């Protein structure tokens, strides 16, 4: 999995719309 360049510590991943998900406070695809 590659990082999406987004964190999800305080807010959910915006990048979920492009297939990313939150893992260990970082958004991965």
Curated annotation (Swiss-Prot):
PTM comment text: Contains 3 disulfide bonds. This is a cyclic peptide.
Cystine residue pairs: 4-20, 8-22, 13-27
Keywords: Disulfide bond, Knottin, Plant defense
InterPro entries, sorted: Cyclotide, Cyclotide_bracelet_CS, Cyclotide_sf
Pfam families: Cyclotide
Annotated crosslink Cyclopeptide (His-Asn) location: 1-29
Protein family per UniProt: Belongs to the cyclotide family. Bracelet subfamily.
Domain note: The presence of a 'disulfide through disulfide knot' structurally defines this protein as a knottin.
Role this protein plays: Probably participates in a plant defense mechanism.
Protein name per its UniProtKB record: Cyclotide cter-K
């Amino acid at each position: 999995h590659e990082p999406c360049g987004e964190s999800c510590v305080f807010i959910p991943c915006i990048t979920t719309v492009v297939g990313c998900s939150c893992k260990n406070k970082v958004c991965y695809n």
